[in-house]
Amino acid sequence: MSLTSSSAPSDSIVELIQSQNLSGSGSGTGGNTGSTTMNSGNFIPTPSLTGTGASQSSGSASSGNFVSPDETDTKPSPSLMDHNDPTSSLSQQLAQGATLTSPYSTTTVDPSSLYFQLSPMSYIPNVSSATTVAAANMSAYFNQKSAYPTSHLGFPSNVGSHSFLQSNMYIPSSLSDCPTATMGSMSWNANQPGFSRKQRRERTTFTRNQLEILESYFVKTRYPDIFMREDMAHKIQLPESRVQVWFKNRRAKARQQKKTLAPSNSGVTCSGNNGSTGGGSSNGSTGSEVQPSSPATTDSELKFSEVIKEECDEQSISPSADDQKGVNSYINPISSSSGTTSYNGTSSFRPQAQYPYASYPAYDFQYSQSNTNSTNTYTLDGNSTWKFQMS
């Protein structure tokens, strides 16, 4: 049997060996002797059996001698049985409720940590006792019946080294495992019976007959009153509000089409009668043509093109004879002979160009030409000092 103690110092073992007088060498006959080997603080009693009637017992304190456990007998020496066995005393102390402490272990367990067993905090990870010493302390603490009885808490007396938390307690490893962190739970109020979300109304689809009735009223008036709207609603079997909204959208569409077609003459062309003024046969179209910028694909666009056609027909009516006379009285027709104008190249663009040089109007004053051969004499202080010939 071997006992290895890593917590006790080596000096205490040496003293124990010296007190038992196990070191030395001797001889004996017909008996069992034991050899003790100490290796770096390891106390290993190794009894040996001899059958020749003589045996030798030796003790060595060298650190280089090792004794194999297979070569030794499992039965301890009688000399060791007489003294205090450390393992038996340790088991007796633990049975009596003593506390085992180690000078190299600083782990202590506070009894107040049992509060976490009663707390509903499920996010505490699964923990266990760190060392066997801590487990022994807890076991010795709960075995004391007189100190703090824990029977009312429902905990087992033998705590051992199992987890302080319940074994069936589930601790999620990530946030996605938590049922309260999902998006479905965040919208819990949407599933409540008192919470009613406003549903969007479906778009009304008009049939061809309904559009024909509405377009016929739109040609008559663009702003029908309540009575006309109710009459239309009764005919097309739709609410009056739908009729009102349709007229509102139809007016907006008409304004938009008018803006796009009015500036460009290529969009809508209204052609009148193209023919001779003498009342002969017409070479062009006898009626008005409507050429929309884009082909009408819906019934509403067809009706709108008909409205534009009627307006063009009214504008393309030829003026009457009386209207033509009134126009001729203000505007003289321009003949083809007077189409060209000749300009005189010699005339200049001056106000006097319309008069010839000989026919200028006479003015009241005339210029007289003086004699160029006369001599002009100038006097200065009565003396004729300045004389010069005028040429």
UniProtKB/Swiss-Prot annotation:
Q: Which Pfam families match?
A: Homeodomain
Keyword Nuclease in annotation:
no
- Which segments carry the region annotation Disordered? 1-106, 254-300, 312-347
Its domain of life reads: Eukaryota
Q: In which tissues is it expressed?
A: Expressed in the bilateral AFD neurons as well as in the nine pharyngeal marginal cells. Expressed in amphid sheath AMsh and phasmid sheath PHsh glia.
Matching entries from InterPro entries are given as: HD, Homeobox_CS, Homeodomain-like_sf
- A single GO cellular-component term on record: nucleus
Q: Kindly report the protein's main subcellular placement as a broad class.
A: nucleus
Task: Output the Gene Ontology terms for molecular function.
Answer: DNA-binding transcription factor activity; DNA-binding transcription factor activity, RNA polymerase II-specific; RNA polymerase II cis-regulatory region sequence-specific DNA binding; RNA polymerase II transcription regulatory region sequence-specific DNA binding
Low complexity composition bias: residue spans: 34-64, 264-274, 335-347
Bias-annotated ranges (Polar residues): 1-10, 86-106, 289-299, 315-334
Q: Does the keyword Lipoprotein apply?
A: no
Keywords, A to Z, come to:
Developmental protein, DNA-binding, Homeobox, Neurogenesis, Nucleus
What is the protein's name according to its record?
Homeobox protein ttx-1
Please report the organism this UniProt entry assigns to the protein: Caenorhabditis elegans
Q: What is the lineage of its organism?
A: Eukaryota, Metazoa, Ecdysozoa, Nematoda, Chromadorea
- From the UniProt record, report the name of the gene that encodes this protein: ttx-1
